[in-house]
Amino acid sequence: MKKVITYGTYDLLHQGHINLLRRAKELGDYLIVGVTSDSFDRERGKLNVRNNVLERIEAVRQTGYADEIVIEDYVGQKIDDIQRFGVDIFAIGSDWQGHFDYLKEFCQVVYLPRTEGISLSLIHI
């Protein structure tokens, strides 16, 4: 069984998020989605997150793409999760191109194309 993992805040879940989750799911047999905790978002300077972590988890669950959802709560958790779950592929949006290459030591890293015309800055009014 090929396991894929991806991470995100998934605030105000939109078509771009859904497309990314679908593409990540298509890479393997089992998709693990890491949703950032409220405190981890604040630590990283994401102060305008509208939905709390439970609302964001529920939105991801409702897409039907996630086989398992975990909460990302600390720096370094990606490596821990990859090893703990026996992940084969780490997938993330291409806007992070190169940023997660250090994970290639642990699994394959795939940068998925963004959905053109979708911007959270256009959604936050």
Question: For each predicted feature, which ranges?
Answer:
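Nucleotidyltransferase catalytic core that binds NTPs
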Residues: M1-L122
